[in-house]
């Protein structure tokens, strides 16, 4: 006989449903309003349904500013920040497998930027560059400011991944005569690769969304979030909603592609282990 659910289950279910509605309801409004008609505004009711604001976005029409250049600038920064975050996090994770002098100090120095307000970090970087007589530009001061946000997450992910790594695999490779380079490339890296991909994804997405730290360090160009913030103070059109919809689709595609890649890697590893088992 099936047991009836307690009343608390239904209460918690309603609360969870309200939370999901509160979280995703505004996003749904943004997606709907992006299909507003040519005479429509940035609020309901809908005045027709069309793709005119997507067309305006790609043709550089009214109310879209310099979104094209801002988008590609953000993409370049995302790739650079993700690459630096991945390489530094993996190197630091390998180094922290053994204790060394000053390891705790270096760790907390790297992590503390997560809790320091981003605007103060960005202001400190801009002030330091000014004292050195250097002008801000996206490719060094902008990237550096965003690394103070993305790198701590990469470090924490890598420490967790390597903390679960079984050293017996590395010891077996050593017994078979593998060098340090071979152990890393053919034993350690394939096992921790899903975590490394996670670090790359975290670095990419955190860089794309970051604006507080890089606002004072971008030089003459804006990133996508900065350009959108600037446009919100001007005459706002549903083109902003079209940008939000396309950005969401792009990020979903990126996440799904990453999950498929990680799943394929895990499947190949499982097949490799199955073939190595004795009959």
Q: Which residues does each PLM region occupy?
A:
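N-terminal signal-anchor/first transmembrane alpha helix
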Residues: 1-33
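Transmembrane alpha-helices
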Residues: 14-27, 155-158, 166-167, 180-209
